[in-house]
């Protein structure tokens, strides 16, 4: 039987796309709006956010320490659902005119990913449905992707494969609870 988003789930299960959207209805609205505006499939957006922030709106990169005790600051400026860097987020706000967009907003983060992935498609030819290669370009930047910088990073290639697999899994799951 088809499960609707209104079905009750006992707890938020981040391995189940329908559970995620049922527990956070505003996520579905954000992902759907991004899909309509930019063409990025909902399951691709969800898979990237899962690996970038585990759906935590204020996610930050880990702290770095000198001698294991003296804090040196964060690994990068990445923040929020999409783990967007300060400079890239500023570029997004300027390019889209969304000057008050916040990285801690699922709506703004999903829109950012749509904007970024659309740029990736234009610059690299990577399909918006190709979660694995979109993730590689998302992580390395479009120029880094074109140069193949990820090829020397087996851990990143493995992670991108996981993003692709999770995207496929989410796509299958979503077919039972929403019309895509």
PLM features: what roles do these ranges have?
Residues 1-2, 26:
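Short amphipathic alpha-helix starts
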Residues 11-180:
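Catalytic glycan-binding domains that act on GlcNAc-containing polysaccharides
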